[in-house]
Amino acid sequence: MVMAKNLTKFYVVFLVVLMMVVSLLLAIEGRPVKDSSRSLTQMRDSSMFNGSVIMSSFKPVESSVKDLSWLATVKQSGPSPGVGHHRAKGYKMFGRANDSGPSPGVGH
C-alpha cells in the first residue's frame, strides 16, 4: 500500500513537470511578433515599454499610412495564394467537365 501511494505521487509530480515543460516549449516555439523591422524582444527593451515615451518619436499619420512595412509580418513563408489562375474563367462551363479524361500526370 505504501508503494502505491509513492507511485501515485510520482505520477502526479511527473504529469505536473511534463505539463510545465510542454507549456514552456510552446511558449518559446512561436516566432516573435515583428513591428516594422524590430522583433518583440527589441521592442520590449525600448523606451516605449520602459515608460519613457518621447513624443517626438511618433510618426505623423501620413507617413504611417505610406509605410506599409508592417505587411511583411502577415505572410513570411508558405505557398503563395495565387493571383487568378484558379478562378472560374468560363461561367458557361461551370458545373460541367471541360476536358474529361485521365490527367496527364505531374510535369506534363
UniProtKB/Swiss-Prot annotation:
GO terms for biological process: innate immune response; nitrate import; regulation of root development. Glycans are attached at N50, N98. Residues 28-92 form a propeptide. Transmembrane segments: none annotated. GO terms for cellular component: apoplast. The modification Hydroxyproline is found at P102, P104. This is Precursor of CEP16. It comes from Arabidopsis thaliana. The gene is CEP16.
